[in-house]
Design a protein with these regions (language model features):
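Structured, active/binding-site neighborhoods that engage oxygen-rich ligands
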Residues: 1-199
Length: 199
């Protein structure tokens, strides 16, 4: 920004306000840096937690003690990161114009109709969805399975919040559209809460 001190017709800018007493949300980082941090944090957290997934705290302590870093030489994420990438790709392709048809088409194109591919892993809600899609059921019927309540949408909802930064209602709306193929009820609400929180 150019200085206005040399231009007589523009009044001098008022003194900067005192720094706030508490921390600034986002730490003064720009939107791109916060988005990158949110998505990298998701992936790193997933890789850190993956070896201990589904273990009881007592089992974790017995095996590793207190975990303060990676516990394997080759950390890798899970389907949580893969499906967050899936949601991010949907947003990159469709943005706020995202519809359930777009989501369902992507499930077929990138996951259900392939024997192998980048979205290899799947939680139980995704497996139920894949089974329904492969049987020819369309959204929202594809989301009617025993695990539609699960956290699968919540695990992939961060990109919606990143995309709709500062607009939690829009982030929640997009998460509900994404989840309409795979989740229902509490499964949708959990994803909306994560997306809105990230936004």
């Amino acid at each position: 920004m150019a200085s206005t001190a040399r231009i007589p017709s523009v009044p001098a800018a008022p003194a900067a306000p005192a720094a706030p007493a508490g921390p600034i949300p986002g730490g003064g980082l720009g939107r791109r840096e916060r988005a990158r941090g949110a998505l990298l944090g998701l992936a790193v957290g997933d890789a850190l937690g993956a070896p201990a997934e589904n273990m009881k705290p007592s089992e974790i302590r017995a095996r590793w003690g207190r975990i303060t870093g990676y516990v394997t030489d080759h950390p890798a994420g899970t389907d949580d990161t893969e499906y967050a990438i899936f949601s991010g790709l949907l947003l990159a392709r469709h943005g706020s114009a995202l519809t359930p048809v777009h989501v369902e088409t992507a499930w077929h194109e990138w996951i259900a109709d392939r024997a192998e591919g980048p979205f290899r892993g799947a939680g139980f809600s995704e497996r139920g969805t894949l089974e329904n899609l492969r049987r020819g059921l369309a959204a929202p019927i594809s989301a009617q399975h025993r695990h539609a309540w699960s956290d699968g949408l919540a695990m992939r909802a961060a990109p919606h919040g990143v995309f709709a930064a500062g607009r939690p209602d829009e982030a929640a709306r997009l998460a509900a559209i994404d989840g309409s193929v795979s989740h229902d009820g509490e499964g949708i609400y959990g994803g909306q809460a994560v997306a809105a929180g990230v936004a």
